[in-house]
Amino acid sequence: MATTAVPAIKIAITPEPPIFQTIAEERLHRKQRLASAFRLFAKFGFSEGVAGHITARDPEHEDHFWVNPFGMHFSQIRVSDLILVNEKGEVVEGDRPVNEAAFAIHSRVHMARPDVVAAAHAHSLYGKTWSSMGRLLDPLTQDACAFYEEHSLFADYNGVVYETEEGDRIAQAMGRRKAVILQNHGLLTVGRTVDEAAWFFITMDRSCQSQLMAEAAGKPVPISHESARIAQQQVGNPRVGWFQYQPLWDVIVREQPDLLD
């Protein structure tokens, strides 16, 4: 019996993330992108007191990660403010403390996912509001399709995460996906670059906002399974996630060049 060939999925051709000649160059690049992500999170209103953290794995010491110092507002963070934390939760570079919750969650995600360079978590308004629904996002828009079959739900809220055992459970719930909804808490995204992890957090929060608004207005019509899977590969792949962040980088560096200090 003859079979019908499945047409190849059309994916936009985009530039690729840079490749570095030295570890020092790669480390600086990751730290610069990390500082820019904090400034953008502040710009988008993702700050909530001292809550929230974005981490970037060190390119040399891969069980260490760079993170924001505890108690510093996202809008004030510069490259020189970032701290380096080892696998024991000790600050080995920098003179500020680490958020224990950041270590409990992110250290276990980085350990479980050696493919992941960065992880982003914040108590963004729409992300935490949607998390209280105890549901996955539906494929209501093209942008939301980035997460179709690519996010999960961690439905075990027990207060602030201080124990690495709970971090292990969060990492297990995420699996090989790019994001997890922490019920009654917020969103967590990961990526092979800081750019990718930050972009997918930004667009996931907006997708939460979009679905909340759509359901408040009426009964939204979801995208079909077949079309959502195609769109997921088109807008949800790592290279596109990295590329989507580049205009945001250009804007924030021009507006707030001190972040590179």
Ranges and model annotations:
Residues 152-189:
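A contiguous binding-surface segment within folded domains or other stable secondary-structure elements
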Residues 66, 117-121, 181:
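Short glycine-aspartate micro-motif
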Residues 2-37, 178-261:
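A conserved C-terminal secondary-structure "cap"
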Residues 24-28, 92-100, 153-161:
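Flexible, glycine/proline-enriched loop segments at strand-loop-helix junctions
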Residues 125-166:
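Class I SAM-dependent methyltransferase SAM-binding "motif I" and its flanking Rossmann-like core
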Residues 46-48, 57-60, 74-77, 110-113, ...:
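Solvent-exposed alpha-helices and their adjacent loops that cap or buttress functional pockets
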Residues 14-88, 247:
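N-terminal low-complexity or amphipathic/hydrophobic leaders
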Residues 86-127, 164-172, 176:
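Short HxH-centered metal-ligating active-site micro-motif
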